[in-house]
Amino acid sequence: MSQNTTHNVHASTPQNARNGDFLAWPFFDDAHRQLGTRLDAWCTQELHVDHHADTDATCVSLVRQLGRAGWLKYCVPASHGGALDKLDSRALCVLRETLARHDGLADFAFAMQGLGSGAITLAGSDDLKQRYLPRVAAGEAIAAFALSEPEAGSDVAAMACTATLDGDHYVLDGEKTWISNGGIADFYCVFVRTGEAPGARGISAFVVDADTPGLTIAERIDVSAPHPLARLKFDNCRVAASQRLGEAGQGFKVAMMTLDIFRASVAAAALGFARRALDEGLARAKSRQMFGQTLADFQLTQAALGDMATSVDAAALLTYRAAWQRDVLEQRTTREAAMAKMYATESAQQVIDRALQMFGGAGVVSGAIVERLYREIRSLRIYEGATEVQKLIIARELLKDG
């Protein structure tokens, strides 16, 4: 697919004047407000969603497009080609919410550049940062985050993929699965067991180039909302020790630090999906005629819209509180980000379901906007920590504080 290809949506993006109202909240400064406004205008002009069967090509094209436009600069610090001195959670959330409201795959392309390179930003040597981050910011290199395994998803400390020190190299053996951007990534941030200590303390992180001998794509995985996804296999895969992120045995800490930064942005993506669903539901309710009146005239519809709008605002407050606390108060936000991720993804599923119901049979037609949203939101309740895991994290933090 060429980078200038345009596509069609079943309907244009509804222009709901309230979509940007949240930017007036005290969580943001003028730079965030301008960022949201500029990206919304860019998305309206440049993103024309009609994803073709070749999801890989579409995703690669979106990464290049986001890079050329400068949006990927917010995924890395200014010292290595980025837009801001350090990663800004509020900017990441505003960007993801806006992209998700327009195009879920564009949000995915942006998000994986940040998540896939975040460990380098946080723990990489100067050499690693210089070699990888400017290319990520320009959209010239596609990043991936390789943490999950066939028998170690949420239980990260149970991972079995190993790296054995051999002179000035490590030899990686094992598998990773559910790897977003798997098959199209230029490099992977891989977390493996190096054995310095039992459990989480014996994990290290490495940057592994996609063309490294011994690394293969064992399986491409198809899911309900198509995006590049794969199972990776490492078989006697030699990686230079200089590719390690941080000290040996610090990989679990690096992974958790990375997820803490980007978890609130998952909530923001869910929020973008929910806002779009609310817009679509409102438009449908006001235009659909039945029994001599509009759908919006029915009290049941009004009650649903009231619940939907309240859920959207509640999710936004939790999401941007977490981002603000990290940016402004410089606080650790493990609990707050988990709350935001849990509530925003769960409530977005409900908002989208109610919007789809307003369309009746038209809502489940393949390719309809609400049908696409229904498929896209489901995975957000699972990846980067399933809802059940977020509840455990919240409880753990409460008990620790108590």
Task: Please identify what each model-predicted range represents.
Residues 142-165:
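A gly/ser-rich beta-alpha-beta helix-loop segment of oxidoreductase catalytic cores
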Residues 235-254:
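Long, acidic (Asp/Glu-rich), low-complexity accessory segments flanking structured domains
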